[in-house]
Design a protein with these regions (language model features):
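Residues lining hydrophobic/aromatic ligand-binding pockets adjacent to catalytic sites
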Residues: 1-203
Length: 203
């Protein structure tokens, strides 16, 4: 079993592991929420370089919360800003228009209250876009340790390798690794699966 954190437009390496390990993958829902991590932050490539897209969450008076209980805040009109950032970054990529309508629903449609639900629904849609079966299994309880591969720190180092692929701004910045799945999807479209397969390090 592999345990991953819930992630907003998760890094490409997460999807490589989901493709390779399928139903062995679980998403952690019981851990204490860790702010400013993949749980509420995606990294995309822009004309100026890397850009963080961070979902604001409601605070709980400094008390620790389980990931499954974290609510999204509507502060700052973030949905509109994130969609505008994605559009600006990828509107000239080969496959943006192909996937834009399905992706826009998450930013222009009915708001989702909980961060975990939003991340999982977005993950399921991205998997459908990629044409891959996606594990949507959640952990049943919190386990500090056990017979599983613990990737809750958000790193897939040692299990995935960096595989360069076409990026719109590569002529300015070179290849930027470790980005959100949105970067791979909008740049490579159906060929994204080939990149994900190449990323897996055989054990």
């Amino acid at each position: 079993m592999i345990i991953l954190p819930s992630a907003y437009l998760a890094p490409v390496g997460f999807y490589a592991l989901m493709l390779a390990h399928g139903r062995e993958v679980r998403t952690e829902q019981w851990e204490h929420y860790v702010k400013q991590t993949v749980r509420n932050r995606a990294v995309i490539a822009t004309e100026a370089g890397r850009m963080n897209l961070t979902i604001p969450v409601e605070h709980n008076g400094g008390k620790k919360m389980a990931m499954r209980d974290v609510k999204i805040s509507d502060h700052g009109n973030w949905r509109h800003l994130h969609w505008q950032a994605l559009r600006s970054a990828y509107e000239h990529s080969p496959f943006f228009e192909f996937y834009a309508d399905e992706m826009a629903v998450f930013y222009e449609g009915r708001p989702t209250a909980y961060l975990l639900d939003f991340n999982m629904q977005l993950q399921e849609t991205v998997c459908q876009m990629l044409g891959m079966d996606c594990p949507t299994l959640l952990t049943e309880s919190y386990q500090a340790e056990g017979d599983f591969t613990d990737l809750r720190n958000g790193s897939t180092d040692g299990l995935t390798r960096e595989v360069p692929y076409y990026q719109v701004f590569a002529d300015r910045h070179g290849f930027m690794g470790g980005l959100s799945i949105a970067d791979l999807l909008f740049n490579m479209g159906p060929e994204s699966l080939l990149v994900l397969k190449d990323m897996i390090i055989d054990s």
